[in-house]
């Protein structure tokens, strides 16, 4: 079998930097899928991505598609011929569809009888005849949310396409992709190297592009070069570069030929909180800040240029000139904000709506203050500090700095609180209330901050669910999934003794206590019928349409939603789905307790006796489900068979033995002990007839199984384990 390397490059206008890597890897994955579907063998696929190009190189691609045989089975021989041996209409119709006569059909013997069959051999095509469609299909399946048209073309793509090059070895694959004919011409860097040049062989890519066009097409090569040179520049300046992975990849996507340079700004700007300076350096300018060994920001930054002049002075000064006004703004906002205390900004929160049915940010602040205090009492935090932090939690949203640099919310509250003389725990809590901000982010360090963070998240979850705005599909405008998972992480990883039902119930009660006439819209007043009190069971003003919603209904919805977040969390940790389902079946509402059960069941699943006991529990569940009547306690004197007496004694002994462990939440120890039941359980089912004719005997045996099941259900429903 002969092979050749295959290259396809799509030359475009500047591609969205945050989407570049995803587009490139998806393109490679799609090409691979199309090649596999076509039955074409290859050794490896490489992908390339630069601001104005996507490329895929297939190594050692077979130049000929293999032939294949298609088998089309017809009716059974018994149904293909009548009693006289003549073909039936069914057989003739099938044969006609195959383009043959019944007599030309072959026969195949199976364990279900003999069948008519027609085999057709399809000769494989030369690979070069297939590649145009393969590439077109791969591009059509790219994740492009908003494709665009350009010029007078009817085709659509993420950006206008200017060149297409497809080479199988040295042979140009002729065809048209996205309205552009395939050609050998590829484009180089906008400002460096040759603007256009021809490529003769797929093997020349990407080196030819670098040599002639001054473009480093390999995304990972550019990324590694930027990282290494940035770290070296920072070291030379006596510091360490702050290089986040997401920003590094974005910068890599912005340049074709990276030139890493260092610049500086005036030291007077260091009087402004570093977070504000870093926000504008990273977010607006795509610069890498530099810190000293003690974590203090240095008056230097690193940037990556797309050109490489002999004297970079003009480029460096230009970047310093660009960033200076932004830093000056931050300095001005900071000095202006310091003139007014955070607490004095509380009245302004009345002017900002949190949500139309849920009131203003001041209403939310009042609820957070009270809920944070309640949570603080339960987790052993300082209640007064938690309430103070809750009261001030949203005040920094009214500052000039946060209005201009939105991502500094929380951290600027911390700096302003310190300036105002607030307690350090209160100040830190203003920053940590938003933690964790994303998957894998750190958690609040103090219990006071944890109380405020939880109060904020539970207030949002309760309110938004209360008005019927739960996430649907991928839409989650209030980030409720993130809030739920963040709350669960705080409770579980800090092992806090909190119950979801209890916290959500308190959050509901606060909505009721703090509501007022301007929150009660016309539909609610109409539904209440003019009564001064809500109907029984309707303890909040939440409505959906014109209907008041019972508290318990929404409590259940929020709890179920939060417990559902556990599934994704544990699956990311590699825990089996059936383990999670086993615990979810018991619906424990204390997250730390839920976690302990998952860890215990995950451990139990590794034991030798787990599979047999899971199957036995499934059998027990089926038996008890059919029992119908109420089942009493075990009567040892009523046991007849040795096997049933042995199991009865074992479960009664273990029921007493595991109770202290259950109380301690040591579920791993509980299941370790219950694992010893395998032998008596197996013996019971091997030697005892549960549905005995004697009603008393039958009821006692059901009681044994009911007690057995109850022991396991104190931890999880292990009958769902696979």
Swiss-Prot record:
Under Pfam families, the record lists: DALR_1, tRNA_synt_2f
Its Gene Ontology cellular component terms are: cytosol
Q: Which NCBIfam families match?
A: glyS
GO annotation terms (biological process): arginyl-tRNA aminoacylation; glycyl-tRNA aminoacylation
Q: Which residues form a coiled coil?
A: none
Keywords, A to Z, come to: Aminoacyl-tRNA synthetase, ATP-binding, Cytoplasm, Ligase, Nucleotide-binding, Protein biosynthesis
Compartments (UniProt record): Cytoplasm
Protein known as: Glycine--tRNA ligase beta subunit
The record's annotation in PROSITE patterns points to: AA_TRNA_LIGASE_II_GLYAB (PS50861)
